[in-house]
């Protein structure tokens, strides 16, 4: 930044507060746990913890894949077509972002009852509900950024609608879709409130952390939190790197 760019320096200073506010808790939880490595070592080999983390990773991944399967086509329709009720559909898609987590759990339980109670389907249903807006909105924005003239040229050259989509539209929107999928996965693996209501079992890492904190206190729950944060950050950074690498290729 230029020395005379006072506005940029002022904004950087204000932004630094938010960076520190987010980064400090991450830094502190690792520092605190470093003084209790024995507890971390025990937690790393605890079968219950291992199973709960596996459940979290599995269900978050499944919900993200389902979100891509159903969300990308919806994003395309919202980007390319005009129809009655479009604004309502877009508002409806954003609704899970503003609904309290516990209310999400109650809504899903009222709707699907025993079909999702205390099973993997319930966990996936919750994660899909809260994370799908990220995929739909990112897909819509990605498709909106694709020049429709490119699709028109492909069609005039004899390509079918489906071939045009997979050879022209999707490749040009893939980075936005991938970014949305990453955010959806992150949102899914962070969900706990609705899962507590819908599917306490099979236990996810989020639920186990809450259980340990309520029953045994901060010291018992902290190692699990450290492990989950480490895995989540590693996956998140790796996926972001892949997307960035593909964008720069």
Curated annotation (Swiss-Prot):
Q: Which SUPFAM superfamilies does the record associate with it?
A: MetI-like
* GO BP field: transmembrane transport
> What Pfam families is this protein classified in?
BPD_transp_1
Q: Does the keyword Flavoprotein apply?
A: no
> Where does the chain cross the membrane?
11-31, 57-77, 97-117, 119-139, 180-200, 224-244
For whether the record's keyword set contains Membrane, the answer is: yes
Q: Which UniProt keywords apply?
A: Cell membrane, Membrane, Molybdenum, Transmembrane, Transmembrane helix, Transport
- Domain (ABC transmembrane type-1) spans 53-239
Q: Which residues lie on this side of the membrane: Extracellular?
A: 32-56, 118, 201-223
Main localization, broad class:
membrane
| UniProt xrefs under InterPro entries | MetI-like, MetI-like_sf, Mo/W_ABC_Transporter_Permease
**Subcellular compartments:** Cell membrane
Q: How does it sit in the membrane?
A: Multi-pass membrane protein
- Those parts of the protein on the Cytoplasmic side are 1-10, 78-96, 140-179, 245-249
- Assembly and interaction partners: The complex is composed of two ATP-binding proteins (WtpC), two transmembrane proteins (WtpB) and a solute-binding protein (WtpA).
To which protein family does this belong? Belongs to the binding-protein-dependent transport system permease family.
What task does this protein carry out? Answer: Part of the ABC transporter complex WtpABC involved in molybdate/tungstate import. Probably responsible for the translocation of the substrate across the membrane.
Name of the protein in its database record: Molybdate/tungstate transport system permease protein WtpB
């Amino acid at each position: 930044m230029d020395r005379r760019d006072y506005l940029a320096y002022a904004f950087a200073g204000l932004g630094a507060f938010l960076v520190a506010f987010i980064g400090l808790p991450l830094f502190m939880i690792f520092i605190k746990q470093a003084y209790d490595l024995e507890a971390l070592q025990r937690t790393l080999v605890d079968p219950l913890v291992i199973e709960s983390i596996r459940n979290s990773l599995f269900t978050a991944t499944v919900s993200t894949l389902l979100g891509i399967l159903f969300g990308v086509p919806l994003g395309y329709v919202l980007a390319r077509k005009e129809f009655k009720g479009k604004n309502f559909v877009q508002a409806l898609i954003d609704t899970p972002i503003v609904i309290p987590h516990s209310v999400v759990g109650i809504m899903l339980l009222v709707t699907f009852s025993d079909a999702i109670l205390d099973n993997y389907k319930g966990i996936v249903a919750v994660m899909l509900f809260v994370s799908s807006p990220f995929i739909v909105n990112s897909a819509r924005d990605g498709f909106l950024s694709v020049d429709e003239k490119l699709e028109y040229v492909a069609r005039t050259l004899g390509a079918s609608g489906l071939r045009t989509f997979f050879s022209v539209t999707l490749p040009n929107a893939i980075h936005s879709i991938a970014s949305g999928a990453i955010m959806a996965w992150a949102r899914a693996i962070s969900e706990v409130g609705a899962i507590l209501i819908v599917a306490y079992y099979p236990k996810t890492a989020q639920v186990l952390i809450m259980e340990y904190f309520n029953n045994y206190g901060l010291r018992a729950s902290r190692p699990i939190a450290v492990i989950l944060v480490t895995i989540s950050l590693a996956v998140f950074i790796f996926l972001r790197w892949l997307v960035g690498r593909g964008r720069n290729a």
